[in-house]
């Protein structure tokens, strides 16, 4: 039988990572909207509601409890963590990073916290790339490319801007995408 070349296998896995990272970005967007809707659905639009001042504090508190008692690991500094994983030439990110940053940021943003979705979704997409690549026993070089694919797909999906995802990966993460 005919076997796939390394380049073909990496391309197929990269496509799968792109789909999964895009689904993660979509899930984050929908989860934020769901939380916001649940919290503010009954509010009257033209009057002051003091809960707008309380919700961000509650969201940060819930996020802190989630990180301390469920995750039990530091999930902050998403982009810095990805850069560190790439710079060590290992490109290894923990499996829980495929979902924990997503849940924590959805809680914080959904409750009105003033944080962005970029760092958590970059960490999520990169972790998907890293863990799927390791599942298929890819080399460190291929893992680095797959981490970049996950980051690019996640940024492209969260901002609905495919070129921005690619530019982010090439410029900020400085990943050489040659296989």
Residue ranges of predicted features:
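Alpha-helical transmembrane segments and immediately membrane-proximal extracytoplasmic
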Residues: 1-179
């Amino acid at each position: 039988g005919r076997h796939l070349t390394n380049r073909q296998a990496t391309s197929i896995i990269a496509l799968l990572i792109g789909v999964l990272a895009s689904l993660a970005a979509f899930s984050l967007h929908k989860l934020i909207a769901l939380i916001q809707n649940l919290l503010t659905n009954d509010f009257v639009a033209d009057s002051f509601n003091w809960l707008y001042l309380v919700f961000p504090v509650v969201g940060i508190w819930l996020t802190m409890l989630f990180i301390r008692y469920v995750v039990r690991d530091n999930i902050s500094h998403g982009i810095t963590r990805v850069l560190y994983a790439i710079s060590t030439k290992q490109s290894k990110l923990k499996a829980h990073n495929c979902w924990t940053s997503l849940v924590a940021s959805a809680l914080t943003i959904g409750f009105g916290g003033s944080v962005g979705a970029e760092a958590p979704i970059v960490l999520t997409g990169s972790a998907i790339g890293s863990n799927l690549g390791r599942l298929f026993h890819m080399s460190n070089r291929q893992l680095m490319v797959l981490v970049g694919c996950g980051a690019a797909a996640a940024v492209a999906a969260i901002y609905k801007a495919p070129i921005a995802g690619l530019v982010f990966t090439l410029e900020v993460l400085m990943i050489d995408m040659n296989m």
